[in-house]
Each structure stands twice: as C-alpha cells, then as structure tokens.
From Swiss-Prot:
Keyword field contains Hydrolase: yes
Top EC category: hydrolase
InterPro entries noted in UniProt: Glyco_hydro_19_cat, Lysozyme-like_dom_sf
Entry keywords, A to Z: Carbohydrate metabolism, Chitin degradation, Chitin-binding, Glycosidase, Hydrolase, Plant defense, Polysaccharide degradation
Catalysed conversion reaction: Random endo-hydrolysis of N-acetyl-beta-D-glucosaminide (1->4)-beta-linkages in chitin and chitodextrins
Gene3D superfamilies: 1.10.530.10
GO biological process: cell wall macromolecule catabolic process; chitin catabolic process; defense response; polysaccharide catabolic process
EC number(s) reported in the record: 3.2.1.14
Taxonomic lineage from the root: Eukaryota, Viridiplantae, Streptophyta, Embryophyta, Tracheophyta
Signal peptide feature range: none
Protein name: Endochitinase 1B
Amino acid sequence: MTAQGNKPSSHDVITGRWTPSAADKAAGRVSGFGVITNIINGGLDC
C-alpha cells in the first residue's frame, strides 16, 4: 500500500488523500475504482 514509481499509494486513493494533478485529470484519471485498478494492474505487475 505504498506508492511505487509513478503510481500513487492505493491506500491514499481509497482514503481520499490522493488528489489527481492537472495531468491526471487530462488523462482521465480521477479518484475511484478505475485508478485503483490501474495502480494494481497498470504496470509490469503481470
């Protein structure tokens, strides 16, 4: 549940401590389930 590389902590997203930057918003990343999915599966995890 710690931030890794360019991905925020999933805990911070769930608890509302993470807020999307202007670049995140422009890319369609906002707080919620979709961001959590990208944190878990969005890198080279698989």
